[in-house]
């Protein structure tokens, strides 16, 4: 399970270090793709395979399913970590998440998320202001 918030910068070659705590759980490689709210989702291979199985069940006749899977897969990349624990994300993913220098890597249960520091700060500020309301909307799962 992934949890926590880590701050790292893209290096001069556009590579990003993934925290050792996450790498230990991930293994040698993972899949990155477009995430929601302008971030990047990163999945260990086993989790990615579960998502692939679910996406394969979406109806081809439904336009929203076609659009989503098209965007989700076209932005996806498999990546191995280099010896320093860095990944080299595609330009498509960096542009999607507006990654320029400062990044925030967040653990979210079965995935990691990579955010630009600016977008993460905006999201966190808004979410923290509405934390109780968000929790109330989820009351049916009985946290």
UniProtKB/Swiss-Prot annotation:
Molecular functions per Gene Ontology: DNA-binding transcription factor activity; transcription cis-regulatory region binding
Ranges that cross the membrane: none
Gene Ontology CC entries for this record: cytoplasm; nucleoid
CDD domains membership: MraZ_C, MraZ_N
Pfam families for the chain: MraZ (PF02381)
Boundaries of every SpoVT-AbrB domain copy: 5-47, 76-119
Keyword Lipoprotein: no
Main subcellular location: cytoplasm
Keyword terms, alphabetized: Cytoplasm, DNA-binding, Repeat, Transcription, Transcription regulation
Source taxon at top rank: Bacteria
Location(s) in or outside the cell: Cytoplasm, Nucleoid
Gene Ontology annotations of biological process type: negative regulation of DNA-templated transcription initiation
InterPro entries xrefs: MraZ, MraZ_C, MraZ_dom, MraZ_N, MraZ_sf, SpoVT-AbrB_dom, SpoVT-AbrB_sf
Keyword Transmembrane helix found: no
Subunit structure comment from the entry: Forms oligomers.
Similarity field: Belongs to the MraZ family.
Full protein name: Transcriptional regulator MraZ
Organism: Lactobacillus gasseri (strain ATCC 33323 / DSM 20243 / BCRC 14619 / CIP 102991 / JCM 1131 / KCTC 3163 / NCIMB 11718 / NCTC 13722 / AM63)
Species lineage: Bacteria, Bacillati, Bacillota, Bacilli, Lactobacillales
